[in-house]
């Protein structure tokens, strides 16, 4: 049996209000999602995360900070990456997906949310798997600027 692999991206940045996480409005249910997507054959988790960020959000030149953890859900190995955003990304923006997957042509509405205890209630199920680790590591990771 082949195990499918998926990368979830916790893209973070510093703001005047504190650490923030990039999310988009879910098209399927109330709440927000993070950028995510299936790995292509031979891709590492980091490579998948970088590709998905570029395809779904139009963002490149991110800094890979760490792997927060992995879960197994419905036969799918889901890895969660902590990445730092480059400067200059707007507070809110839209991007139309590129690439050859199901996201191609889909327009996503992105925004930044504060990284705190309220985040868990705002994210759709599955995207919230490593929120505690995100909260614990984000301030430290961003404090090194």
Regions found by a protein language model. Give the residues of each.
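Conserved N-terminal beta-strand and adjoining loop/helix that marks the start
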Residues: 1-21, 41
């Amino acid at each position: 049996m082949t195990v499918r692999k998926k990368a979830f991206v916790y893209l973070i940045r510093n703001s005047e209000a504190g650490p923030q996480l990039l999310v988009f409005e879910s098209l399927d249910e109330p709440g927000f999602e993070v950028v995510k997507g299936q790995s292509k054959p031979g891709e590492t988790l980091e490579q998948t995360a970088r590709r998905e960020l570029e395809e779904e959000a139009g963002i490149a030149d991110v800094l890979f900070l760490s792997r927060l953890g992995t879960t197994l859900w419905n036969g799918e190995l889901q890895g969660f990456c902590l990445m730092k955003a480059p400067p200059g990304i707007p507070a809110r923006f839209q991007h139309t997906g590129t690439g050859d997957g199901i996201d191609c042509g889909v327009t996503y509405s992105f925004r930044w949310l504060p990284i705190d205890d309220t985040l868990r209630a705002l994210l759709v199920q599955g995207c919230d798997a490593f929120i505690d680790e995100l909260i614990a590591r984000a301030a430290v990771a961003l404090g090194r600027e």
